[in-house]
Amino acid sequence: MKCDKHTMLLYAVTDRAWTGRETLRQQVEDALKGGVTCVQLREKELDDAAFLQEAMELSALCRSYGVPFIINDNVEIAIKCHADGIHVGQEDMAAADVRAKVGPDMIIGVSAHSVEEAQLAVAHGADYLGVGAAFSTHTKTDVDVLPEGRLKEICDSVDAVSYTHLRAHE
């Protein structure tokens, strides 16, 4: 699948802490039925075997809806589950190294917090940027919120699709 403004229109990032009584699969399917255009599986607590199992299941689910499925931070899992893409942060594998490992067809997303990080990521093969955080979030409590105007500066500096963290009630 290709990365464009339409596939990134409503980008859902999973958070097991919010599942409540539903399974993560149920929540992802509800999101897909509700119009989500891209799903990122973000798992920080699962071992690789459990992560791969969940990734395989959600990858198949997203494929059945024609929606890109992205793995957060784990290139090996992304390759093994035939994900449509991989998202890496600044402290993870560099975009150029990811591109060399996954080839030209997998979508690569990179977190960026400055114009310089954004431009470097795009120059090294990123298809989209995760920019932010624009607001404080419950999923990333240690992150600094971007200064006013920074999101626009970053978006204006690159030719790539960008997203930022928005709260559901905003």
Listing of model-derived features with the role each one plays in the protein:
Residues T164-E170:
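Conserved small/polar residues in nucleotide/adenosyl-binding loops
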Residues G89-Y163:
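Conserved anion-binding
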Residues M1-G85, Q90-D92, K101-A126:
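Conserved N-terminal beta1-alpha1 strand-loop-helix module at the mouth
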